[in-house]
């Protein structure tokens, strides 16, 4: 089982401090040195945790009222990481298809995959927070319908097809990705989903090469994953896909202090051996990649986790 780290690219992410983009890239180097086999970047512009997370049934305390958080732009970081690293897998966890025209996004993805030498996993999602969509002028109505149409454009373009599309939200006319990246079929597509409805489950079965189970906001122990996988597996069978063809990627919260920032969540905690055992429980369930949201996300924490990563 491979391990990964979600890089702390957002405001106040490192014990209340915000890393510059250059400092974040240097931190990525330290993560690779510690033994992480993959690096991940989320895709947000701006959110107001007290308001936005409430829509996800996560209630921050009153002192968070009015506080806003942003993030360095995802694909700028991905391009820099692709040029800076040599061996590790790079992925988005996940990129919001509503933020960029899907044909343009496919062109960006293909370019970054080529820069990386074919090490990219492209995680795609429909978007989470109304605040950032409205702030930056994007519609947030009918996000699943938009997401499905975006997938119907991104996937064939990444696979090398020429595409003419006249849809409800997007249009292309003879679009193709030229020149094409080092992988003729493009990078694997991963769709992130924990508690999706029937439509999102169908999209995982129909479009995804990998599925990500995002647990840092919930219970990061393996029982949560098992319940979610049962839903995804059943959806694959319902829509005529062998579940064994869907690679599995899980993101967990790992807390090395008493200050995990997400209210109500249950991250992995404990000694080195307790963390190793909790992670290996995922390997026993067939998970290929276990990525982590680490608190505090510091160089000292990377040193603490190095023996855990070596054991996995």
What positions do the PLM features span?
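Active-site-adjacent structural elements that line small-molecule/cofactor binding pockets in enzymes
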Residues: 1-312
């Amino acid at each position: 089982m491979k391990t990964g780290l979600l890089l702390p690219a957002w405001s106040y992410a490192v014990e209340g401090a915000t890393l510059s983009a250059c400092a974040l890239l240097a931190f990525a180097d330290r993560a690779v040195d510690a033994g992480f086999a993959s690096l991940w970047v989320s895709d947000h512009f701006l959110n107001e945790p007290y308001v936005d997370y409430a829509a996800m049934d996560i209630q921050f305390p009153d002192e968070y009222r009015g506080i806003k958080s942003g993030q360095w732009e995802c694909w700028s970081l991905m391009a820099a990481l692709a040029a800076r690293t040599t061996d590790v897998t790079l992925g988005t966890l996940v990129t919001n298809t509503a933020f960029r025209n899907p044909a343009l996004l496919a062109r960006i993805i293909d370019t970054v995959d080529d820069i990386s030498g074919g090490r990219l996993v492209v995680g795609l999602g429909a978007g989470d927070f109304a605040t950032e969509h409205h702030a930056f002028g994007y519609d947030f109505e009918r996000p699943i319908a938009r997401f499905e149409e975006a997938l119907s454009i991104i996937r064939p373009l990444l696979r090398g097809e020429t595409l003419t599309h006249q849809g409800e939200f997007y249009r292309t006319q003879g679009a193709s990705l030229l020149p094409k990246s080092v992988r003729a079929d493009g990078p694997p597509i991963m769709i992130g989903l924990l508690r999706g409805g029937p439509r999102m489950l169908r999209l995982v079965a129909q479009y995804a090469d990998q599925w990500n189970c995002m647990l840092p906001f919930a219970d990061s122990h393996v029982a949560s994953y098992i319940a979610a996988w049962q839903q995804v597996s059943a959806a694959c069978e319902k829509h005529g896909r062998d579940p064994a063809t869907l690679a599995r990627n899980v993101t967990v919260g790992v807390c090395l202090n008493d200050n995990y920032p997400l209210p109500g969540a249950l991250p992995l905690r404990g000694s080195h051996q307790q963390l190793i055992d909790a992670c290996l429980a995922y390997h026993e369930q067939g998970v290929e990649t276990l990525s982590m949201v680490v608190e505090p996300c510091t160089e000292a924490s990377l040193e603490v986790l190095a023996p855990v990563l070596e054991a996995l």
